[in-house]
Amino acid sequence: MHTFLSKTPPLRDYISKKKSLLNITEIANELPKLLLTNNVQNKINKLKVNELSVDILLKNKSEKEINLAMSHLSFIAHAFMWGGNKPEKILPEVISKPWVKLSKYLGRPPILSYASYCLDNWYKVNKKEPISLDNVALINNFLGGVDEDWFVTIHVCIEDAAGDAIDAAYKLSRLNESNNVDDFNTNLKKILTSLKNVNNIFSKMPE
């Protein structure tokens, strides 16, 4: 394991061309405007029960598409519950049904988790360039402000920077008294360098 980020960036769009997935994408993309105008609940309440279905993704077991849908629906669900003048007590079946299905498949509760908010919610502005604070943006957000995006993209970069430490720690766990001391030192130095890079990124959080 090198990092908690996927080896390739998360999907920004569904490969499967189903109307329900287009509906999910449209609502997720519109969340900043829907929240600003207090129209999230109105938008969702007009939908029929299966208009946000993810059954095709579960049937195909398309992992990256499933992660994208989990992120989309998590944002939509939280926006519905908390985006009005007062918190909603009931989440409509049109959201809860597909959300719970995805949650059961992934083995985690239906909530906007760190995975859906950060690990599966980024892309590189320039695909040819490495992950950096100047080259990472969010797929989904609530209001789309600088503070919201910056807080999450910093965590993406931290996860990337910590990758060498995770890799070195794993290699250290495989060493024993028969290994050369240089093997230990090399990996310990990698951990130190990695953590210094992580702390440097952390220091930019207030910016």
Predicted regions and their residues:
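Extended amphipathic alpha-helical segments with heptad-repeat/coiled-coil character used for oligomerization
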Residues: 185-207
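Non-transmembrane, amphipathic alpha-helical segments
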Residues: 57-65, 146-157, 180-190
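Long, charged all-alpha helical bundle/coiled-coil segments in cytosolic proteins
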Residues: 46-139
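Hydrophobic faces of stable alpha-helices that mediate helix-helix packing
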Residues: 155-169, 195
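Charge-rich, low-complexity segments
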Residues: 35-46
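Long, hydrophobic, amphipathic alpha-helical segments used as structural scaffolds
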Residues: 84, 169, 173-180, 199-206
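Intrinsically disordered, low-structural-confidence terminal and linker regions
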Residues: 1-35
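Short, charged/polar, low-complexity loop and linker segments
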Residues: 134-152, 168-175, 179, 186
